[in-house]
């Protein structure tokens, strides 16, 4: 096999490696029962959490009291038709008067607060914490050698820096390759659609299409396999474009060491004890995830719209600290403190990361919440990692004054 052919086959193999996982994440099976998550295995034959059974058998005739649940996330659509009646309202604030009526340091915080915005706008994308740490340590260690004389503390930092740089370069290379392959995939798909000559495509169109090269053959094969899952072409095309957006964000924002949007916030980032910054736009530029989470918790159970939330007494306090990228410890800590100080009894944190910039400031906020008898719920993640062996921040182990994690 010629060298150029081997290169082509290697690229094609990697192309399939990149593309197939994107679709495997979106595979569809039989439609689940409505509100399956609230159903019961014994009563309904569904592995739900037995919400409906609890209401009918344990809570029947009982009247609950409202509980404020803070959703620390990427934003919440407080006007969503299935949530708007379940949103926490700060009755001490007068809407839109530009005054901090309740003197808590946050102007017009009617439904919560956004710690990653300002009068300049909102942060949508940010780096991974890994990238921020590499950028922070670069001036000191980028040109250092293994033979360079360091103190014990510096040697530890240098070794950690080398480890992080290796991880960063590996992630960046994979993301760049993924983006390149998604560009090829998108261009090939556009070419195929143009040749077919119609927009409302069906399976038969791809069965009748004659690919002119190996890439087209693979694209057609993938699209046909997606049609076999009873998907419409519009949905398939959306998933392809989402794949492109995923890798584009990784390359241009998450892993771009020259990208730093913090100036939008305008805070003193080195001052972890700074509290009052941000704005009151709790929805932000992308509230899909936070709205989803809030809906699971508290979507109206009586309006026949969408799903029914787990609780009919939860009131959602929206706190925005999570961008498209890794959240920052200072913002997480302030989000926790804001929730506690403004009456939340439960804090939901559906986010996490593998590195921490300032673990101590988050630990102190967690301890503060515990002292006020507030329950914190933190996600384990979606990537099947053993979090006893691999870091996922914030975690249950507090750091001492030297930053070393101690116990649980």
Segments from the language model and where they lie:
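Sec-exported extracytoplasmic/periplasmic mature domains
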Residues: 56-60, 76, 88, 298-302, ...
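Subtilisin-like serine protease catalytic core
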Residues: 56-69, 76-328, 406-407
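Proline-centered loop/turn at the N-terminus of a beta-strand
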Residues: 68, 315, 345, 373-375
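Hydrophobic residues in well-ordered beta-strands that form the structural core
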Residues: 107, 318, 348, 376-378
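Bacterial Sec-dependent N-terminal signal peptides
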Residues: 1-29
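Sec-dependent signal peptide cleavage junction
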Residues: 3-4, 25-46, 374
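Short acidic, glycine-rich surface-loop motifs adjacent to enzyme active sites
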Residues: 28-41, 143-177, 183-186, 336-359, ...
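Substrate-binding/specificity loop regions of serine endopeptidase catalytic domains
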Residues: 328-329, 352-408
């Amino acid at each position: 096999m010629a060298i150029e052919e081997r290169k082509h086959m290697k690229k094609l193999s990697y192309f399939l490696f990149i593309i197939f996982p994107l679709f495997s994440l979106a595979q569809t099976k039989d439609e689940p029962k409505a509100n399956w998550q609230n159903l019961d295995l014994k009563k309904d034959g569904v592995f739900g959490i037995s919400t409906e059974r609890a209401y009918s058998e344990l809570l029947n005739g009982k009247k609950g009291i409202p509980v404020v649940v803070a959703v620390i996330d990427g934003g919440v659509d407080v006007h969503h038709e299935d949530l708007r009646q379940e949103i926490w309202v700060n009755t001490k604030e007068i809407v839109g008067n530009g005054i901090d009526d309740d003197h808590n340091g946050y102007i017009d915080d009617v439904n919560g607060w956004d710690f990653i915005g300002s009068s300049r706008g909102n942060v949508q994308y940010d780096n991974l914490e890994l990238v921020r740490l590499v950028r922070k340590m670069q001036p000191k260690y980028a040109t250092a050698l293994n033979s360079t004389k360091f103190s014990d503390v510096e040697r530890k930092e240098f070794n950690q820096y080398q480890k992080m740089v290796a991880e960063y370069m590996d992630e960046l290379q994979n993301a760049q390759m993924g983006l390149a392959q998604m560009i090829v995939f998108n261009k090939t798909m556009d070419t195929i659609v143009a040749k077919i000559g119609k927009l409302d495509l069906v399976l038969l169109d791809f069965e009748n299409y004659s690919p002119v090269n190996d890439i087209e053959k693979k694209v057609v094969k993938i699209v046909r396999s997606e049609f076999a899952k009873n998907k419409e072409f519009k949905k398939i095309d959306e998933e392809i474009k989402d794949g492109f957006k995923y890798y584009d964000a990784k390359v241009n924002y998450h892993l771009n060491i020259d990208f730093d949007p913090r100036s939008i916030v305008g805070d003193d980032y080195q001052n972890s004890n700074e509290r009052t910054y941000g704005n009151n736009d709790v929805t932000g530029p992308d509230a899909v995830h936070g709205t989803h989470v809030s809906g699971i918790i508290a979507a109206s159970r009586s309006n026949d719209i969408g799903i029914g939330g787990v609780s009919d007494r939860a009131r959602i306090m929206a706190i925005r600290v999570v961008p498209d990228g890794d959240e920052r410890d200072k913002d997480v800590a302030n989000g926790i403190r804001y929730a506690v100080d403004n009456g939340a009894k439960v804090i939901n944190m559906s986010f996490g990361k593998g590195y921490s910039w300032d673990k101590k400031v988050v630990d102190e906020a967690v301890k503060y919440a515990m002292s006020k008898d507030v329950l914190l719920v933190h996600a384990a993640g979606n990537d099947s990692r053993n979090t006893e062996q691999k870091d996922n921040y914030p975690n249950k182990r507090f750091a001492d004054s030297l930053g070393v994690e101690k116990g649980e």
